[in-house]
């Protein structure tokens, strides 16, 4: 069973925190901004799969934003990793994001499962959508929140690469190549 979700990791926004400080000297987080000519993105999109049985988070950052084509690439990557450790089924628990319920993703899961059944090998996917407006039911959500608190920089601005590396370090997983869709050739 795996809980899937996407998360934006901002280089600028600060998470809500609670902390102790000396009386009369409150702890402060510095809000930053970037110049208009900064080539790095203000935020990074990341797909994650939380596997409670393995006590692991699998992450892949995305060049761009979450879309159906990237979603299928992420799920395929997860299936490859699960097959390598001897699993047969992925019960995929995720929300009703448009890129999860799209025709492209539903068709891909159907084709994938038919190919697994025909070949007799691979990972079968059972898609379980959470009720709408119920993100707290996804076990990965608290992990994102705690991760954001672990990677933030109190008084500096992280670069996109450093932010991605800190996120992967916080979740004790490798920083893999970012997922992207191939450029359309005209």
Predicted regions and their residues:
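RNase H-like polynucleotidyl transferase catalytic core
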Residues: 23-37, 112-142, 155-156
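Conserved Walker B catalytic segment
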Residues: 105-113
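Acidic/histidine-rich, metal-coordinating catalytic segments
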Residues: 5, 87-101, 130, 138
């Amino acid at each position: 069973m795996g809980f899937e979700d996407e998360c934006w990791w901002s280089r600028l926004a600060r998470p809500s925190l609670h902390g102790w400080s000396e009386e009369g000297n409150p702890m402060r987080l510095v809000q930053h901004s970037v110049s208009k000519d900064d080539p790095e993105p203000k935020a990074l999109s990341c797909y994650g799969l939380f596997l409670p049985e393995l006590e692991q988070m699998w992450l892949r950052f995305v060049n761009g934003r979450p879309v159906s084509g990237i979603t299928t690439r992420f799920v395929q990557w997860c299936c490859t990793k699960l097959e390598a450790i001897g699993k047969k089924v992925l019960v995929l628990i995720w929300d009703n994001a448009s890129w999860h319920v799209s025709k492209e993703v539903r068709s891909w899961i159907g084709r994938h499962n038919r190919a697994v059944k025909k070949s007799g090998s691979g990972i079968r996917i059972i898609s379980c959508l959470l009720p709408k407006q119920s993100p707290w039911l996804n076990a990965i959500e608290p992990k994102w929140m705690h991760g954001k608190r672990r990677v933030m920089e109190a008084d500096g601005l992280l670069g996109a690469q450093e932010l991605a590396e800190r996120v992967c370090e916080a979740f004790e997983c490798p920083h893999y190549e970012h997922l992207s869709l191939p450029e359309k050739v005209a």
